[in-house]
Amino acid sequence: MPSFDVVCEPDMVELKNAIEQSNKEISNRFDFKGSDSRVEQKDEALILFGDDDFKLGQVRDVLVNKMAKRNVDVRYLKDDKTETIGGDKRKQTMKIQKGITSELSKKVVRIIKDSKIKVQASIQGDAVRVTGGKRDDLQETMALLKKEVTEAPLGFNNFRD
């Protein structure tokens, strides 16, 4: 029986490439000369450093731009906290969203059931498994979810025939 999983995970390789490109652009830009502005990745979070609020905003804009060019959805990042570290220097932490929250998974299951497509959806941890009789039904379900769910970037993997 054909099936696939609905997940919410960024491509970590592309995210790392976007971070490296951001740091390279920041080091080469004239308006960042002599500043300690950079982007670091620690486990499941990104840490942005800037000399002041304006430069921190510029670092964030550069990162978002590079993520968009590498097809990494910005909705994977959730602003956590901004703090002052010594003098005027600022640090912002952004959490990387991995996995579907329970409320989002319930919404996905409800959308699938309300659509009357002949598929079954079951919540399995931080993913939703969708199984159906025909491949076309699964593809129709994918299109429906892409259209209906806008608050989180959904991905589809483990497509089995």
UniProtKB/Swiss-Prot annotation:
The keyword Nucleotide-binding appears for this protein: yes
Pfam families xrefs: DUF520 (PF04461)
GO cellular-component term (any): cytosol
Protein name: Nucleotide-binding protein Pnuc_0290
Taxonomic superkingdom: Bacteria
Function: Nucleotide-binding protein.
PANTHER family named among the record's database cross-references: UPF0234 PROTEIN YAJQ (PTHR30476:SF0)
GO molecular function: nucleotide binding
